[in-house]
């Protein structure tokens, strides 16, 4: 595919590379991999990871069509489902372009926890390894599919510090700094936190401010008496901030499932989320700008 014929899919370029959408190939994401991950050694690691995982047909993971080299550019070509990257959804919500309701945010969070938990429950302790908002596709019915799973072993080979993983790739790592099921849980916690904040926290000091961000987390309208307290305890365990940390997403999922919420409110999430995803996919007109976006929500919570 000629890059001049391609359309940028993800406006938020990250340390993994640059994402493109191939208009001639259906729902195809082409990721031009960053130099750090596209060395000849890491190319072989990525190809091996693709072959290792592809044979299992894991429904949580979007299928990679191929890994190809064109001169100095290594590209990972992935078949993505209809939907919108979570990074795009949160960016739109942050700036008030769409109204991602509390019940829709909780529904996506629950779908994410369930999806990663199902992955971790499989034999052989499989991992994703690179859970960021750019690697989550949210579908109209609220289900999610994960991309970017080819990089787990390559990331391990880089020997980055926790701070470097964050600054370079936007990956929040546990104290062990190992790419494993616990790092998946920590990154899952960051995605859940981002959903309730309606933005992806950024900046070089995010790790240092996690405790403060968790303290302000709220499920909003779906909350009942103990919801927010239970949500903060869950996030604290995911981030190793207090209480026993989760060993994997199976444990995290069992605890998340016990968080009490307004069932009727969460049950209404699907039509709301369907509208938001269709708006972002160009199938419905954009709504009037939501005044204040995340800033107004934060001020309301503080008051």
Where would I find each of the regions flagged by the language model?
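Flexible N-lobe loop architecture of eukaryotic-like protein kinase catalytic domains
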Residues: 55-61
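Structural motif in protein kinase domains
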Residues: 81-93
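Short beta-strand micro-motifs within the conserved protein kinase catalytic domain, predominantly
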Residues: 63-74
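Protein kinase catalytic-loop region centered on the HRD/HxD motif
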Residues: 112-127
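C-terminal lobe helix-coil module of Hanks-type protein kinase domains
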Residues: 171-290
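Activation segment/activation loop of eukaryotic-type protein kinase catalytic domains
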Residues: 128-172
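ATP-binding glycine-rich loop module of kinase domains
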Residues: 7-55
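Activation segment signature within eukaryotic-like protein kinase domains
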Residues: 108-109
């Amino acid at each position: 595919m000629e890059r001049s014929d391609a359309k940028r899919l993800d406006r938020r370029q990250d340390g993994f590379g640059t994402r493109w959408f191939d208009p001639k190939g259906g729902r195809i994401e082409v990721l031009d991999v960053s130099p750090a991950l596209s060395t000849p050694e890491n190319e072989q690691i990525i190809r091996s990871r693709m072959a290792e995982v592809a044979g299992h047909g894991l429904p949580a993971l979007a299928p990679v069509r191929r890994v190809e080299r064109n001169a100095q550019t290594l590209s990972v070509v992935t078949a993505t489902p209809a939907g919108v990257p979570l990074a795009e959804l949160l960016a739109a919500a942050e700036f008030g372009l769409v109204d991602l309701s509390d019940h829709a945010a909780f529904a996506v969070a629950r779908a994410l926890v369930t999806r990663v938990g199902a992955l971790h429950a499989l034999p052989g302790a499989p991992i994703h390894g690179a859970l960021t908002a750019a690697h989550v596709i949210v579908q109209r019915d609220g289900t999610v599919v994960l991309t970017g799973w080819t990089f787990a072993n390559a990331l391990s080979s880089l020997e980055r510090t926790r701070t470097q993983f964050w600054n370079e790739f936007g990956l929040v790592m546990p104290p062990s700094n190992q790419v494993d099921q616990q790092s998946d849980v920590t990154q899952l916690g960051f995605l859940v936190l981002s959903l309730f904040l309606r933005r992806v926290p950024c900046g070089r000091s995010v790790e240092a401010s996690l405790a403060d961000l968790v303290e302000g987390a709220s499920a909003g309208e779906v909350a009942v008496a103990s919801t927010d307290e239970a949500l903060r305890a869950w996030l604290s365990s995911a981030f190793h901030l207090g209480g026993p940390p989760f060993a994997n997403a199976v444990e995290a999922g069992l605890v998340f499932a016990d968080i009490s919420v307004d069932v009727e409110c969460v049950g209404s999430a699907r039509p709301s989320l369907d509208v938001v995803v269709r708006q972002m996919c160009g199938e419905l007109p954009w709504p009037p700008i939501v005044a204040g976006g995340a800033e107004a929500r934060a001020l309301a919570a503080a008051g």
